[in-house]
Amino acid sequence: LLPNWQTTEYGSGWAWNDYNESYMPERSALPIYGNVVELKLQQAGSRLELKPDIHFFRFAINELADPLTQNIRVVRRQNKNTFDVLNGRQPYTTSQFPFMTYENPRLLEDTLKIEWRERVRFAQALPFKTLHSQPTDSLLKPLMHRSDNFFAEQTLLMVSNKVLGVMSESKIIDTILKTDFKDLPQAPRWADGSGLSRYNLFTPQSFVAILDKMEKEFGLERLKEIFPAGNDGTLRNYYVSDSAFIWAKTGTLSGVVALSGYLLTKKEKLLL
């Protein structure tokens, strides 16, 4: 996997101090558990539940008493897979926290029940084949409905590996801008797969052009199965009475909240 990996765990323009937030897991060539660990604590002093509950994370928990803390807080140390649990007096439910992926082999050891050894010898003439998991739309639907940054990043890297043979968001973005997106009204400034980067800039006219391109290539019926409808996904509690006529995706670009998608009028006219 490593020879194909030609990028970093964080994207260009990501906020480095968001490393502890669930919406910014590290990217990796072979993600495990979504590169996050889930911690659950019903009340102060109770047993901390882990998901996945494996010894790698069990030994990474460091419980601390903090008399000044009302709420229980969990903070991962910035450059280490150590999670400090600051005990407070208020109940704590469930949260997810990214872990550092450089120790992935240790996670695989626990999961696969195979001892990891640093010295690796490559076998010769073994059969090689690609194993496919979920159909494409089964990945894209939760990505769009949850606005899942991790899915978006890893999907772009998988596209890069499929098209270019390497995992590099910068190389695949450059390729797409020179091919599929070469005729956009304005050349976008595109930095990553999720939109976490503060460097991303797309004009509304370019969004409309991309939506038009997708509708012509894939058809509206397929897109309706992928995009959130009114009162669904990130549109929950919005456009409730118009749920059968709107399919769209929310997004934030450099501090501006946007909504891009499709609207079907009473006269059956499709608006982008």
Positions of PLM-derived features:
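Periplasmic/cell-envelope proteins involved in peptidoglycan metabolism and beta-lactam response
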Residues: 1-68, 76-78, 87-89
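C-terminal soluble interaction/assembly domains
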Residues: 186-272
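A generic structural signal for nonpolar/aromatic side chains embedded in well-ordered alpha-helices
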Residues: 30, 143, 225-227
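Extracytoplasmic
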Residues: 25-27, 34, 69, 78-82, ...
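Secretory-pathway/luminal and periplasmic proteins that interact with or process carbohydrate-rich
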Residues: 6-10, 152, 235-237
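A small/polar active-site loop signature that marks catalytic segments
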Residues: 63-222
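Short, glycine/proline-biased beta-turn/loop segments that scaffold the active-site neighborhood
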Residues: 3-9, 119-125, 229
